[in-house]
Amino acid sequence: MASKAKTGRDDEATSAVELTEATESAVARTDGDSTTDTASKLGHHSFLSRLYTGTGAFEVVGRRRLWFGVSGAIVAVAIASIVFRGFTFGIDFKGGTTVSFPRGSTQVAQVEDVYYRALGSEPQSVVIVGAGASATVQIRSETLTSDQTAKLRDALFEAFGPKGTDGQPSKQAISDSAVSETWGGQITKKAVIALVVFLVLVALYITVRYERYMTISAITAMLFDLTVTAGVYSLVGFEVTPATVIGLLTILGFSLYDTVIVFDKVEENTHGFQHTTRRTFAEQANLAINQTFMRSINTSLIGVLPVLALMLVAVWLLGVGTLKDLALVQLIGIIIGTYSSIFFATPLLVTLRERTELVRNHTRRVLKRRNSGSPAGSEDASTDGGEQPAAADEQSLVGITQASSQSAPRAAQGSSKPAPGARPVRPVGTRRPTGKRNAGRR
């Protein structure tokens, strides 16, 4: 009987040791292959799925040299166009003459033809302002002399016979006015003052709320947006009007909003980063970009829809050139602002932060721990959210190992509490009860 009891204890101890060894080998495999497992798990998800969930669809910060090169090329083209081509300034900046009269059934092409036959040159612009019975034809041209203005009014009256307030054809229905070039200059001066005040307030807020490196990155991104938008106007030849100047100020607000969204997530991900070795600062910033990527895209799409509606109303329904100029600069600014907030501002922030001693030391610690082959190092090898299941599995296996290693000595010592499902073990040194009352006294 004693030999059977000893055999039972040996079997349980052997089972516990085998379970511990199997669990430890599973943990070792998990530690050695965590990066491979993470990559295989991410491989099962499509690009759009990873893009939507923010689990590392884009490597932006890691390729920031590429994006800096692209951004630098864009800025270089914009500056070259501004320097060599210049801008197409509207009448408000160059000065000129405006002639208007009730539309009636007049078409733009007819007005342009009458203007050319009367003065021998093309008008700067001919637009239909308003709709219905109150619609008017507005002609903008270079500064005309009084004789040229009178000649043009006569030609327009003979061709279209615009009606006055009494419903009868009248030359008084045709009005003209001179626009001074100083008016556009005054608007530009006020816009520059507003821009400087805006940048100062933005710099103060971001410095107090976040940090100075984010301030430098955000201000640089806004200057990038202004330069590229102005370059597009110069390259394509869009007319620069006071509405364009006002639109440039409005896109700064959108660009800043989109940039702050990403920066807020970066600040959240990197809070206390120096106390952990899971990811480097650059990897945390790249994760923040991916986590806010869809939010930025959705914000841009929602911002573009009313701008497109404004352009539709301005061009096809009302024919208001001012609204068209305002909507056009906003459309260009939204596209450029979305690009800069993702591919320029955050990579620039990472570049500035990596010049600090704190971030450099932390990056060296993370890389050193990864290269050492420790479980934490292999866990840190991945830089996206998809590694969390592997880490959870590893922790579960470690817990099983600890429990098994503790149960093995208890089994070897003959614990009075057998494991569930284990074969009952008879205590050593005891005899089978006989069922008789005084059997033990014999």
From Swiss-Prot:
Residues 433-442 have a biased composition (Basic residues). It comes from the Bacteria. The keyword Membrane applies. The keyword Transport applies. Residues 1-39, 366-442 are annotated as: Disordered. GO terms for cellular component: plasma membrane. It holds the Pfam family SecD_SecF_C. The chain crosses the membrane at residues 67-87, 187-207, 218-238, 243-263, 301-321, 331-351. Residues 402-432 have a biased composition (Low complexity). Keywords: Cell membrane, Membrane, Protein transport, Translocation, Transmembrane, Transmembrane helix, Transport. GO terms for molecular function: protein-transporting ATPase activity. Its main location: membrane. One of its GO terms (biological process) is protein transport by the Sec complex. It is a multi-pass membrane protein. It is found in: Cell membrane. Forms a complex with SecD. Part of the essential Sec protein translocation apparatus which comprises SecA, SecYEG and auxiliary proteins SecDF. Other proteins may also be involved. Belongs to the SecD/SecF family. SecF subfamily. Part of the Sec protein translocase complex. Interacts with the SecYEG preprotein conducting channel. SecDF uses the proton motive force (PMF) to complete protein translocation after the ATP-dependent function of SecA. NCBIfam families: 2A0604s01, transloc_SecF. This is Protein translocase subunit SecF. The lineage of its organism: Bacteria, Bacillati, Actinomycetota, Actinomycetes, Mycobacteriales. The gene is secF.
